[in-house]
């Protein structure tokens, strides 16, 4: 463990085998409930006023929830990682055991897949946190899409940046 941050000192790729088999959902432990998360983060000025949006749908395309959060003065990459963590936490807290993430951040997608190294200390801490959560979900996937294919999440991220007083602690519109 890194004594300064309380996070693992080494990084693991999504494609590395889990440290313990119990980290992943056990085979035959019930039906897979997969949530689809369109995520986006942004910062005006980069760094600057930042926020993220998460648009969550079920496997039939029905809206499950939308999340927006204002993050204060941050970078766009910090906001992208924060959106991913919000999607992971929502899935786990609401009984979904699988997650498919769609993002327009090539950097985030390639870092989570292990194709790029995480060099920024701020992002490394978020990356490690995301990887701990990812190992608890099966199936998990992440894919890159063009910005035009991620409009709902972009709208929510911009709404967070436009409404910091409403989204400072996070805003969740849950369809349950």
Task: Go through the PLM ranges and name each one.
Residues 73-78, 82, 118-121:
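Residues at secondary-structure transition points
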Residues 56, 125, 169-174:
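Compositionally biased, low-complexity linear motifs
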Residues 1-27, 31, 163-165, 172-176:
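N-terminal intrinsically disordered, compositionally biased regulatory/targeting segments
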Residues 66-71, 86-87, 130-134, 171-176:
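Short C-terminal domain-edge/linker segments immediately following a structured domain
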Residues 12, 28-78, 89-97:
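RNase H-like nuclease fold core
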Residues 42-46, 85-158, 165-167:
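RNase H catalytic domain
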Residues 16, 63, 67-69, 113, ...:
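RNase H-like, Mg2+-dependent phosphodiesterase core
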């Amino acid at each position: 463990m890194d004594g300064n941050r309380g996070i693992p000192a080494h990084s693991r790729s999504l494609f590395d085998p889990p440290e313990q088999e119990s980290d992943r959902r056990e085979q035959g432990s019930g039906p897979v409930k997969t949530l689809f998360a369109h995520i986006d983060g942004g910062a005006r000025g980069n760094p600057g006023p930042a926020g993220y949006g998460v648009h969550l749908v079920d496997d039939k395309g029905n809206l499950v929830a939308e999340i927006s959060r204002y993050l204060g003065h941050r970078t766009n990459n910090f906001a992208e990682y924060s959106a991913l963590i919000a999607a992971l936490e929502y899935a786990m807290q609401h009984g979904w055991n699988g997650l498919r993430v769609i993002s327009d951040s090539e950097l985030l997608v390639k870092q989570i897949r292990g194709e790029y190294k995480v060099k920024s200390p701020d992002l490394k801490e978020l990356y490690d946190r995301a990887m701990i959560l990812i190992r608890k979900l099966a199936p998990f996937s992440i894919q890159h899409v063009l910005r035009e294919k991620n409009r709902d999440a972009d709208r929510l991220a911009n709404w967070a940046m436009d409404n910091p007083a409403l989204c400072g602690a996070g805003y969740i519109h849950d369809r349950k």
